[in-house]
Structure formats: structure tokens, C-alpha cells
Amino acid sequence: MSRLNEYQVIGRNLPTESVPEPKLFRMRIFAPNTVVAKSRYWYFLQKLHKVKKASGEIVSVNIISEAKPTKVKTFGIWLRYESRSGIHNMYKEYRDVTRVGAVETMYQDLAARHRARFRSIHILKVVELEKTDDVKRQYVKQFLTKDLKFPLPHRVQKSKKLFQATAPTTFY
């Protein structure tokens, strides 16, 4: 079970006499629960479309589940984050079985490399890269070769005695 979920939040301005059916705004937001998802929705909506929570309403909040959660996919993530030295745009690629898993890895990666917290990271776009030509980063390309083999270091013998007179060595 992952820490985050992907939510689709749809909201709008409150209806008035001049605008009886206001425009709907939809966002896909990664958050641990619906409360945080709604909060992030209003934060981004106020910045993008000048719609405040006091003069708006949320129409629906739905959780989005992965279509194929057993297939390994490559995801490209466009993001911007606020650091101590300013705002930075970034593009990163991750291999995972779900979008949520890739985004979680991205949050951990940015926390480790750049000391960026959840609140200061804004995800702009998450895209599944279906063609291998679309993959830009070498650290992901190395796993896309045809006959990929991994070394098997530090192997242990298969048949072991029940009792052994000497301490076992693990270097073969």
C-alpha cells in the first residue's frame, strides 16, 4: 500500500445570477487523503484561475486507480519546486508499475537530493512514456535494453547440511 493516492478533483465558482452555470475546473492531484487533495486543489486553483475556496465549491472528488498495476512502465514527470535559492523547473523519469509509485519515488528523490519538501513541490504533468525513443535520461535508458542481465554476487550454495562444524563463508 502506497502513502499517496491520485485524486481527480472537480470544482467551480459558486453560481450567481449573472453566471448560473460557472466553468468547471478539473485537476489530478497526488495526496495522502481527500482532505489534503481538496486543500491542494484550492491552492492551485487560486494561483491559476483566481478562484477562492470562499467563493467556490467542490463538485466531486474521485480516486483514480491504475489500469494495469502489474506492468512496469516508464513515467516522465514535469515539476517545479521552491528551494532556498529560488524556483526551479525540472523533468525527471522513473520506472514503476503505477503513476502513484513513480510520484512517490520522485518526492523521495527530491527530498534526498535537493531537500525539497512535499509542500514546495508542484507537479505540472505526469506522462507514461510508451516508446523507448521518448526516454531521455540515461539512468532509465540502461534498463530498456533487450536482453538485460543482472549479476548474481554473493551467492549461497543450494544444498546445505543441517549442522556445520565451521562458521559458513559467504564469499564464493
From Swiss-Prot:
GO terms for biological process: cytoplasmic translation. InterPro entries: Ribosomal_eL20, Ribosomal_eL20_dom, Ribosomal_eL20_eukaryotes. GO terms for cellular component: cell surface; cytosolic large ribosomal subunit. GO terms for molecular function: structural constituent of ribosome. Gene3D superfamilies: 3.10.20.10. It is found in: Cytoplasm. Keywords: Cytoplasm, Ribonucleoprotein, Ribosomal protein. SUPFAM superfamilies: RplX-like. It comes from the Eukaryota. Component of the large ribosomal subunit. Mature ribosomes consist of a small (40S) and a large (60S) subunit. The 40S subunit contains about 32 different proteins and 1 molecule of RNA (18S). The 60S subunit contains 45 different proteins and 3 molecules of RNA (25S, 5.8S and 5S). Belongs to the eukaryotic ribosomal protein eL20 family. PANTHER family: 60S RIBOSOMAL PROTEIN L18A. Component of the ribosome, a large ribonucleoprotein complex responsible for the synthesis of proteins in the cell. The small ribosomal subunit (SSU) binds messenger RNAs (mRNAs) and translates the encoded message by selecting cognate aminoacyl-transfer RNA (tRNA) molecules. The large subunit (LSU) contains the ribosomal catalytic site termed the peptidyl transferase center (PTC), which catalyzes the formation of peptide bonds, thereby polymerizing the amino acids delivered by tRNAs into a polypeptide chain. This is Large ribosomal subunit protein eL20. It comes from Candida albicans (strain SC5314 / ATCC MYA-2876). The lineage of its organism: Eukaryota, Fungi, Dikarya, Ascomycota, Saccharomycotina.
